Amino acid sequence: MRELQLIGPHRLEWRERPDPTLRGPRDAIVRPFIASRCDGDTLPIHRHVSRPMQAGLRLGLIDPIVAGICGNVPFRGPFGIGHECVAEVVALGGEVTGSAVGDIVIVPWAVSCGDCVECRRGLTAKCSTTSAGVLSAFGFGPASGPWGGMVADLLRIPFADHMLVKVPDGLDPLRVAAASDNLSDAWRTVVPMLEQRPGGSVLVLGGAAQSIGLYAAGLAVAQGAGVVDYVDHRTERLEIAEKLGATAHRVPKGKLRLSDLPGRSYDVAVEGTSTAAGIDVAIRSLTPGGHCNAAGYYLPPGTKVPIMHMYGNDATLRVGISHVRPILPALLDFIAREDFPAEVVTTRVADWDDAPDAYRERTTKLVLRRPRLGAA
């Protein structure tokens, strides 16, 4: 079968791998027919980062946990890339009861069992059954397990009754192309807080977490936030934020300052710039008791946080990987019920066969598609 592999910066290729097979009665084989590019994938695609990050790890300039996720030479190719997909079930082990051949499903980016202590606590990305290290995941290379990337002809899914989440009937799969990661990640940054503070105000700092920030802004509007301010320097993303109902604010490219913001305080702030300055500004923008959710990558081990300001303002900062599997049922139900137009964030829909070229494009949200089996 074919799998899209990252060979090096700006270079991706289809490469052959053995077809996956059912290895146990709880396995499933699925065929992805829609895949989207995670915001984080653009880092190794568009930049020469492997050797600089290796040096940074050696010199203590990058937190050592990065090696546990991406390897001692982070993002060194070739490896299968991609960890967001909508797939069709094509084969099932004998003990799988929750899915049927032909079902359309979301596959979470992190591989989890559903039964261990971590999974029962909702920390499915930290599953102790599937991971011997930091993560067990699709699309991050061998350090995160043998699963390969999701831009592939077929995938083996262990613990299928737990892992596979059916897409509601009538819901366009293109609308939930990023539900495996970025769309769910955005959900957890705003919706739980707005459920606690109905009508609350939301600030989104857009940037490196390109689609996450936009999904978060749109979900906040759909959840009934009283104010949703989206701050960014890039025209394409500002226009998308406005289409989703947020108020867009252009700021200069470069280090973000508190004076760049609209001049009010917020119940919820989503930090998507992946910078220490963004963390500082987001925290200082909060109302008393406000929540800042950081959705970026913060590689240096000494990223500064204004702890005393947080103390005085009773602020909460949440940083952590996304635990998608527990989120998916509520997210999919919300999108179907509220007709949330997540596809507005998609800036390029490309043919599946064109993946090596399409994945190199500099665009906010890339989605690949091909026909379902038997589709006309």
Enumerate the language-model features and the residues they cover.
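Glycine-rich beta-strand-centered segment in the early N-terminal region that forms part
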Residues: P20-A35, S50-R120, G148, P168
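NAD(P)H dinucleotide-binding glycine-rich loop of Rossmann-like/cofactor-binding domains
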Residues: D63-H83, C113-L205
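Mid-domain Rossmann-like dinucleotide-binding core that forms the NAD(H)/NADP(H) cofactor-binding site
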Residues: I104, K166-G254
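C-terminal hydrophobic helical "lid"/dimerization subdomain
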Residues: T235, A276, D280, R325-A376
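A short acidic, Gly/Pro-enriched loop at the edge of an enzyme's catalytic core
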Residues: S259-A269
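Helix-to-beta-strand junctions that scaffold the AdoMet/dcAdoMet cofactor pocket
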Residues: L286-T287
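Glycine-centered, small-residue-biased loops immediately flanking beta-strands
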Residues: G290-H291
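Rossmann-fold NAD(P)-binding glycine/threonine-rich loop
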Residues: G296-D314, A330-L331
